[in-house]
Regions:
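Conserved nucleotide-sugar donor-binding catalytic segment
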Residues: 87-171
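Glycine-rich, basic loop-to-helix element that forms the pyrophosphate-binding segment
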Residues: 8, 21-38
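Short aromatic/hydrophobic "clamp" motif used to bind/position activated sugar donors
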Residues: 43
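A conserved acidic beta->alpha catalytic loop
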Residues: 1-7, 47
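Membrane-proximal basic amphipathic "stem/tether" segments
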Residues: 177-206
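Acidic donor-diphosphate engagement hotspot in glycosyltransferases and nucleotidyltransferases
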Residues: 5, 31, 54-60, 81-82, ...
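Hydrophobic/aromatic residue at the end of a short beta strand that borders the catalytic acidic motif
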Residues: 27, 46, 51-57, 77, ...
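Conserved donor NDP-sugar-binding/catalytic core segment of glycosyltransferases
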Residues: 51, 55-85
């Protein structure tokens, strides 16, 4: 990284057990490297700019249930100044299965904690939406999925997918077709496509 991230990390070096800084094939390749060296029972990915919602959150989550395959919660979107913008348009349901993602990613990956027994590697054939596929594969394996009923993460508005909307939407359609079938995916994308067309008309741009 050449954006000053390493300098920030050095300030917190006493709290970081291992730092790797080397070339990679993109975001998801770097995350795969993290998965490969993870030694704990669970993984939780937060990207640069994202934060755990509050101190003691993990302790509270595991007090609710100590043996879930997947924990998920809500997300607070913040701007670059750390000001809260609000929650995501898609909100997590009280109960969650992989089938619920037919209409979109109901839980952001910043607010989902997954047992290492459920996880595989990110599929590097997807450049923008590999997290969607990764979460779906984990949910398919999971038997016990617990909703924390609280905000898990503060998510910095922007990022790779938002700056590449059209390629990201195309990848997500392909991923959903793989998991749900073409016609089911096409049907569920009709309202999404309508909203996108309205957006284009109103803004006269992509």
């Amino acid at each position: 990284s050449s954006d000053g991230t390493k300098d920030i990390i050095k300030r917190y070096s006493k709290s970081i057990s291992r730092l790797i800084s080397e070339p990679d094939k993109g975001l998801y390749d770097a995350m795969n490297k993290g998965l490969a060296i993870a030694k704990g029972d669970y993984v939780w990915f937060l990207n640069a700019g994202d934060e755990v919602a509050r101190p003691g959150l993990l302790m509270h989550i595991f007090d609710l249930c100590s043996d879930a395959d997947v924990y998920y919660g809500d997300t607070m979107i913040v701007d670059f100044e750390g000001r809260e913008i609000g929650g995501r348009r898609l909100t997590p349901p009280e109960t969650l299965t992989w089938r619920d993602f037919r209409k979109g990613m109901l839980v952001s990956h910043q607010s989902i904690i997954i047992s290492t027994k459920m996880t595989g590697s990110y599929d590097l054939s997807y450049r923008f939406s590999a997290d969607f596929d990764w979460v779906l594969r984990a949910l398919k394996k999971a038997n016990k999925i617990v909703y924390g009923r609280m905000i898990f993460s503060r998510f910095l508005d922007g990022g790779l997918t938002k700056s590449n909307i059209l390629p990201g939407l195309k990848e997500r359609f392909l991923i959903m077709t793989k998991h749900y079938g073409f016609f089911s995916t096409l049907f569920n994308h009709l309202p999404i496509a309508l909203k996108f067309i309205i957006y284009l008309i109103r803004n006269r741009r992509f």
